[in-house]
């Protein structure tokens, strides 16, 4: 049985710092406002708050273009606001993790500006330069937006490398002074009280550290882990790792690198299951996954702040997911993914959105919820690229969705105000008034998951079920067994279960009131409604 750490029991809630709530009325979300909404986040059952970047930034890439890693952008607040937010969160039982964006900086960062001016500058080797771009380098991350990962800089008289946007030059992660700067960043924020970091673009920075060879770059993760653990043994590193399934093991190491890894592999196959209304794709993905080392785990989610990346599941499967969830060309991006939020992808069907959450919370690993998914927020396809899924939180039917008291024209990003997902219809205040709303369903699921934490750290057993629309996962601890079932199909079914332990299985969570119960033994059968889910437990004492 795996050693259980505090994060194995976690439920993470991701907040876009600029879009969650605006306390001072300038139209821009801020840290003081997030502090005011901590009770809401905690009421959902969340135990960890993940903040997207709030550092000094030109804001050309939603804050991931950082010009000072140690200073909050004044639009978000001050370092005092950060410390107060962390302290208040801790009082409520919430830990706070922040972004560690070290694969690149903003082109406006003082390091890059100094590097451009003088080839003899000590900051010149902080970045990757070339007189002529290599012929066989990686393609750009944003095809159709960027033509190459190399950009000519007139002032520097050389090309610089940028894996992402041209205004985000890549750091030279094989250069010791850069690593020393990163150590200072980690130290600063751990001393401020954060409980860990989400390591942005982890697979790309490994390649940079190894000068194109991932094998030589993995030790950087070991080093970062050592730095973090030396300062706070409880702090975590959560890595953004989109790689082939067999390569995840390198990011865990022997349990001495990343403790938590975002499971892009499983996320892609989850959407294939939802598109096909069959459990088989998720089953296939789970069977292929590596087992995390002791003290480590995968992290699962439904949708994040980027596109749904479908690379790696095969062209035919990718086309099927896109055809199902992004039938219009405007819904796809970068030739690889879907730029929609969860609720519009599932046609606003509360049953189906609830099912997706039930699957998320049943999967082995730690769940992440993105702000707004719990109420079924929509997207704004008039916004470019990934910004379609980055709109203000919808708190009420009041002006600006209750997000800000600023004039609507003063909002940098406006709430969704038309269509079936408009804020006048989809908002927290309205959802709280209806006992069967998606918000209440998701909250009940999460609260159940925080009590039945077996998926966070225990090995799972995949059940062979008929019909194949139903996903079945069984977890066993020293004191109980937990059975989780989910029907991916819109058709009601009767599930034939494999032999289970004799005795009565107590219901934990159900999508509706069912007339039948579960007793173990052979040939047990259970009813499941279309997009239904049922969780059970059985004591071993």
Residue ranges of predicted features:
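Active-site and adjacent substrate-binding regions of carbohydrate-active enzymes
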Residues: 1-541
């Amino acid at each position: 049985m795996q050693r259980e750490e505090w994060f194995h029991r976690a439920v993470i809630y991701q907040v876009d710092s600029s879009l969650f709530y605006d306390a001072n009325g300038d139209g821009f979300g801020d840290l003081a406002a997030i502090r005011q909404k901590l009770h809401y986040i905690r009421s959902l059952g969340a135990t960890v708050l993940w903040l997207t970047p709030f550092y000094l930034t030109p804001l050309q890439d939603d804050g991931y273009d950082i010009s000072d890693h140690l200073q909050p952008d004044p639009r978000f607040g001050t370092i005092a606001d950060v410390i107060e937010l962390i302290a208040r969160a801790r009082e409520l039982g919430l830990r706070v993790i922040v972004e560690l964006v070290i694969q690149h900086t903003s082109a406006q960062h003082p390091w890059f500006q100094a590097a451009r001016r003088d080839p003899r500058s000590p900051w010149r080797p902080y970045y990757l330069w070339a007189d002529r771009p290599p012929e066989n380098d990686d393609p750009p991350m944003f095809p159709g937006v960027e033509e190459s990962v190399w950009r000519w800089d007139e002032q520097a008289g050389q090309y610089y490398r940028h894996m992402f946007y041209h205004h985000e030059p890549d750091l030279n992660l094989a250069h010791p002074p850069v690593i020393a700067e990163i150590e200072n960043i980690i130290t600063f924020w751990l001393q401020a009280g954060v409980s860990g970091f989400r390591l942005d673009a982890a697979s790309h920075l490994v390649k940079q550290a190894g000068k194109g060879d991932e094998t030589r770059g993995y030790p950087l993760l070991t080093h970062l882990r050592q730095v973090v653990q030396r300062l706070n043994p409880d702090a975590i590193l959560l890595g953004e790792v989109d790689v082939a399934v067999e390569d995840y093991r390198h990011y865990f190491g022997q349990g001495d690198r990343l403790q938590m890894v975002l499971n892009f592999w499983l996320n892609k196959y989850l959407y294939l299951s939802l598109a096909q209304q069959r459990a088989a794709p998720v089953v296939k993905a789970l069977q292929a996954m590596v087992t995390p080392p002791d003290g480590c785990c995968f992290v699962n989610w439904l949708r994040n702040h980027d596109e749904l990346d479908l690379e790696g599941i095969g062209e035919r499967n990718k086309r099927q997911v896109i055809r199902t969830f992004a039938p219009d060309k405007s819904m796809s991006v970068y030739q690889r993914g879907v730029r929609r939020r969860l609720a519009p992808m599932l046609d606003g069907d509360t049953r189906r959105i609830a099912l997706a959450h039930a699957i998320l919370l049943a999967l082995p690993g730690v769940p992440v919820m993105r702000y707004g998914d719990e109420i079924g927020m929509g997207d704004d396809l008039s916004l470019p690229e990934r910004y379609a899924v980055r709109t203000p939180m919808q708190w009420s039917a009041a002006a600006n969705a209750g997000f800000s008291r600023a004039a609507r024209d003063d909002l940098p990003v406006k709430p969704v105000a038309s269509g079936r997902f408009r804020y006048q219809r989809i908002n927290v205040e309205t959802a709280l008034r209806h006992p069967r709303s998606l918000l209440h369903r998701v909250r009940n699921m999460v609260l159940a998951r925080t009590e039945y934490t077996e998926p966070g750290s225990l090995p799972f057993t995949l059940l062979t079920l008929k019909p194949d629309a139903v996903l079945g996962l069984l977890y066993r601890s020293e004191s109980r067994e937990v059975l989780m079932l989910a029907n991916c199909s819109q058709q009601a079914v009767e599930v034939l279960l494999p032999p289970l332990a004799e005795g009565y299985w107590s219901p934990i969570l159900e999508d509706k009131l069912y007339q039948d119960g579960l007793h173990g033994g052979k040939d047990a059968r259970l009813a499941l409604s279309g997009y239904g889910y049922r969780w059970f437990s059985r004591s071993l004492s």
